[in-house]
Amino acid sequence: MSKRNQVSYVRPAEPAFLARFKERVGYKEGPTVETKRIQPQLPEEDGDHSDKEDEQPQVVVLKKGDLSAEEVMKIKAEIKAARADEEPPSADGRIMYRKPVKRSSDEKHSGLSASSKKKKTKEEDEINKQDSVKKNSQKQIKNSSLLSFDNEDENE
């Protein structure tokens, strides 16, 4: 059992004719398992790859309400400040979960709200009832102004 743990792979020496052939062709050795285990040090960037001055989009102001270049720069600065305020990711690479911030009742009703099908049908029924009551009262008013055959009978 202990001999299994001591097994290792020894790469044999490359034959001379293969070494000469690779040298003539200019063959470059691919990554090995050991080189893949080493993580390269990437330069740290803010993630703003297109923020170089010559790569920024052109700002065109067509109307009075359009954003100007200065306003765009202010907004970008605010976004960067907001990112800086956030907690940096932990060094050990673990994902941290936080509870969501509770909203006030005003904010709950101001946005889109989901409701159940029962509530929707109840609300629709109430609206339909109100509409039918209005229509019935209008029909009664219209009925009184419609032609009547009783008047003709009385005239004869």
Swiss-Prot record:
Transit peptide found in the keyword field: no
Modified residues (Phosphoserine): S50, S148
Keywords annotated in UniProt: Acetylation, Phosphoprotein
Superkingdom field: Eukaryota
Residue positions where N6-acetyllysine is found in the record: K108
Biased composition (Basic and acidic residues): 121-134
Regions of compositional bias (Acidic residues) in chain numbering: 43-56
Any Pfam family the entry gives: DUF4604
Residue ranges, annotated region (Disordered): 22-64, 81-156
Protein name per Swiss-Prot or TrEMBL: Uncharacterized protein KIAA1143 homolog
